[in-house]
Structures are given as structure tokens and as C-alpha cells.
Amino acid sequence: MAGPRVEVDGSIMEGGGQILRVSTALSCLLGLPLRVQKIRAGRSTPGLRPQHLSGLEMIRDLCDGQLEGAEIGSTEITFTPEKIKGGIHTADTKTAGSVCLLMQVSMPCVLFAASPSKLHLKGGTNAEMAPQIDYTVMVFKPIVEKFGFVFNCDIKTRGYYPKGGGEVIVRMSPVKQLDPVNLTDRGCVTKIYGRAFVTGVLPFKVAKDMAAAAARCIRKEIRDSYVNIQPVQEPKDQAFGNGNGIIIIAETSTGCLFAGSSLGKRGVNADKVGIGAAEMLLANLRHGGTVDEYLQDQLIVFMALANGVSRIKTGPVTLHTQTAIHFAEQIAKAKFIVKKSEDEEDAAKGTYIIECQGIGMTNPNL
């Protein structure tokens, strides 16, 4: 697909892998040739890392595109997309690079393919600096499906830092268009639940301690809440390596979902891991928003593509979200307005409304 190349500065704003994910996904969807320069320029190890490379190669293969400059450490790539196709698409970070971030870049694209897709993703399922697969399934999935599509996510094996080795299969069918969403009514918290897991050689007591510490911490602030956090020993054949972590979800009367999560590290006791997740959840409940700080930016591309006006209510707008908006406006020409919520209750809490006039992307194949 010919046309002028869209020029992206990979060092601005969030300045990391997210710029690559948003810009290449939109380039692929819109058939716009792309050049990204200064990739991760401000990071301690600039340029492409293995997980970025596997994401780029996956997008290239999704649309039989051309990709130049794609090697570890490269700070500039050019990408020329062709037609998006369904079928089986595979990506392997060969490290603990996050499978959830591979989903972020590929899912919007295969929604506009000609036929159903199966994404076979390998890497870390529960990795630092990325959503945990539990978050993707328990929070991201039910909310993003409000845009008018469904997907199936089958966790074959869990993989942890530093080895990775996780495996996830995502199945989804294409859509004609995406519906806009209106997520502005939070309602009140009706239940709090989650899972605290251990895998490999770690004793089950660690899972129980994480769950108990998290529940205690939550009950201090939300006194009458029923907190149901299940301790789980992952089956040996479904987890690769040693790890522990916890995710806690708060669900509201209007179907909003908020999460707090934490992963264990060597030398950090179980109570501290549990309390870390609980405090993150409580922080996300203190603002008046309808999505938590980690869901904000993951919805921006879908809002940009949708056919109509979408609105979401958030707490403080994160740098990741500001970055996604910047590139959705630059590349897709979607129009965003971010303003403080006018609701009196929200004003004191730093609550915002993100509104987007989507471009009404239509699947040419359907």
C-alpha cells in the first residue's frame, strides 16, 4: 500500500515499547507505511528488545508486510503493511517478555481480518512491567468486549521471569465495525475477589499468606466488604518455573472492574506482596473513575477505531494513556478530548472524562 510514510518519534512521552505497539497496529489497520525512529532512546538499553521484535514480526506476518531494521538493539524501523489476513499467527518472545503485550498489538488488527484468527503466543504470562494474564482475562476482556466483539483466551502454560515458557492461545473472529462505549457510571463496589498463586517449588503457605494479608488490608478501608481471594497452587504441568503473585478484582453494580496485582520477588515476604496488590486496588477505587490506571491506555486504540463517540471516566490520566492518545490522533486522525469530570463528587478526586470521536473503521473484507 503506497502513500507517504508516517514518521513517528519513538523517544517522546512514554518513550518505550508502547509507542511501537500503538503505531504499528494503527499502521497495519490503516494501510499506512510507517517509520519509527529513536526507539526507546531514553531507556538504559535503547532500541528493540526481544519482546518488541517478536511483536513487530507478528504484525508483519499478520499482513504480509515489509519490515526493515528489525533487530535487537535497533533504534529505527520501517514498516509497510499489506492486507490483514486471518488464520494462525505465532509469536514467541523466547524470554519472559509478556504475551499480554503481544495481544495488545495484534488483537485490534485481526478484528479487521477477512477470516477468524488463532494467535499462538509464547513468553511470560505473569511478568513485571506488563499486565498479568489474569488481568487480561478478568478485567481487560469483559470491558473491551463492550466494543462489540468477543475473544477466547486459553492459558496452556504459565511462564514467569526470567525463563518465560508460558503459552496462551487466543481465538477471535473479525467484525464489520467496532461499537463505541460509554463507561461513565461507576456504581458501587459489590464484590471483591481474586487469586493468590504459587508455582514450582514455592510452598502453598506463601499463597495463603498473600491472600490473608491482602484481605486484612482491604477490610481496614472497606469494612463491610466480603473479600474472597483464593490461594492456588498452579499444577506442575501448567506452569514453567517458580513464581508467586496475586491479583484482586473489585466489581461494581454497573459492571466496572478494578484490579490490584503484585508479583513476588526473591527476598520479599508474602505479606508484603499481598499488601502491595491490596493497596494498588484501593488506590484505584479512591478516584471516581470507571476503569483502573492500567485499563485506560489499553482502550484508546479501540476508542479511536470505533464508529461513534466513546466516553470513559478515569482517575489521573497516565503517561501511557496520553501517549496512546497522541499517536491515535497523529496516525488514525481520531479526535480526543480529555477534560476534568464536572460531577461534584469527582472534582476533588482528580477524575477525568476521556471522549473520542472514533474514525468508524470498516472491515473491507466483510
Curated annotation (Swiss-Prot):
PROSITE patterns: RTC (PS01287)
Reactions it catalyzes: a 3'-end 3'-phospho-ribonucleotide-RNA + ATP = a 3'-end 2',3'-cyclophospho-ribonucleotide-RNA + AMP + diphosphate
Amino acids binding ATP: Q104, P131, Y294, D297, Q298, H320
Primary localization class, coarse: nucleus
Gene Ontology BP annotations: RNA processing
UniProt superkingdom: Eukaryota
Keyword set includes Cell cycle: no
GO-annotated cellular components: nucleoplasm
InterPro entries attached to this UniProt entry: RNA3'-term_phos_cycl_insert, RNA3'_phos_cyclase_dom, RNA3'_phos_cyclase_dom_sf, RNA3'_term_phos_cyc, RNA3'_term_phos_cyc_type_1, RNA3'_term_phos_cycl-like_CS, RNA3'P_cycl/enolpyr_Trfase_a/b, RPTC_insert
Top enzyme category: ligase
Active site residues of this protein: H320
EC numbers, comma separated: 6.5.1.4
Keywords (A to Z) from UniProt: ATP-binding, Ligase, Nucleotide-binding, Nucleus
Transmembrane segments: none
A single MF term (Gene Ontology): ATP binding
Gene3D superfamilies for the chain: RNA 3'-terminal phosphate cyclase domain, RNA 3'-terminal phosphate cyclase, insert domain
HAMAP family linked: RTC
Function recorded in the entry: Catalyzes the conversion of 3'-phosphate to a 2',3'-cyclic phosphodiester at the end of RNA. The mechanism of action of the enzyme occurs in 3 steps: (A) adenylation of the enzyme by ATP; (B) transfer of adenylate to an RNA-N3'P to produce RNA-N3'PP5'A; (C) and attack of the adjacent 2'-hydroxyl on the 3'-phosphorus in the diester linkage to produce the cyclic end product. Likely functions in some aspects of cellular RNA processing. Function plays an important role in regulating axon regeneration by inhibiting central nervous system (CNS) axon regeneration following optic nerve injury.
Family membership: Belongs to the RNA 3'-terminal cyclase family. Type 1 subfamily.
Name listed for the protein in its UniProt record: RNA 3'-terminal phosphate cyclase
Source organism per UniProt: Pongo abelii (Sumatran orangutan)
